[in-house]
Amino acid sequence: MQGTKIRLLTGGLLMLATVGYVQAEALQPDPAWQQGTLANGFQWQVLATPQRPSDRIEVRLSVNIGSLSESTQQSGFSHFIPRLALTQNGGLPTMQARSLWQQSIDPKRPLPPAIVSYDYSLFNLSLPNNRNDLLKEALSWLASASGKMSITPEAVNHALQGEDMVATWPADTKEGWWRYRLKGSTMLGHDPAAPLKQPVDIAQLKDYYHKWYTPDAMTLIVVGNVDSRSVAEQINKTFGGLKGKRETPVAVPTLSPLPTTPVSIMTDAVRQDKLSLMWDAPWQPIRDSV
């Protein structure tokens, strides 16, 4: 009986030791995930997925700027700049640029071509697989939008007359709960969906673009069945020539703590009454786990 107890005790200690070892083991990065930074500060990440050859190639360009950094006179600039970019060819022939955007939306899971929030702007392209030519065109277009965009009275008027395809995050910045959540926040009064003030100050819009759209504040992400080395070379060739450097830090979004009292919010967007239990949370989760 005593021997049995000793064996059980020994086994339990071994199990505890094993569990402790497993919990202490550091997560290893995926070797298929490549990343780098160009000489101008432009960051890129590429995840090759040869095990999923039929998946579309997902391309995202994130710019660390949003409506929170706008002054009163600049209200609407952060939303309008992607809108203006989407009306331009980005150095591509007109029909070629049009074909690129027609093919860059996933019919099964469509995303808006651009999203603007309080502290970031995001361009989204979803390309058909095995189309390296389209990927090259997409990178070329993004590089043009990132630092070579034409900002003239004619270009601005053309963009204002066209459809606004830029979405915001949150999707509805006027929604009752979100307006309640913004009370006491630094984000209040900096609506990413704010319309552009008329008449447009072209010089001020151009200065805003060149001040905030700098390569050291951009991150490009490519995921799909691609050749990582070839894509990295293409990124260096396409984005390496972008100029500019951030001289002013961006404003940091913050939310005030939620009060621990119930609240009733009326909205026309919900047809049936609902009861929600909310946990307090920061504006965004931690994005870098390394």
Where in the sequence are the language-model features?
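Extracytoplasmic
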Residues: 30-33, 39-42, 52-62, 72-77, ...
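Gram-negative bacterial Sec-dependent N-terminal signal peptides
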Residues: 1-23
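Scaffold signal of the M16-like zinc-metallopeptidase fold and its non-catalytic homologs
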Residues: 138, 145, 166-215, 235
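An aromatic/glycine/proline-enriched structural segment found at the starts
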Residues: 188, 219-284
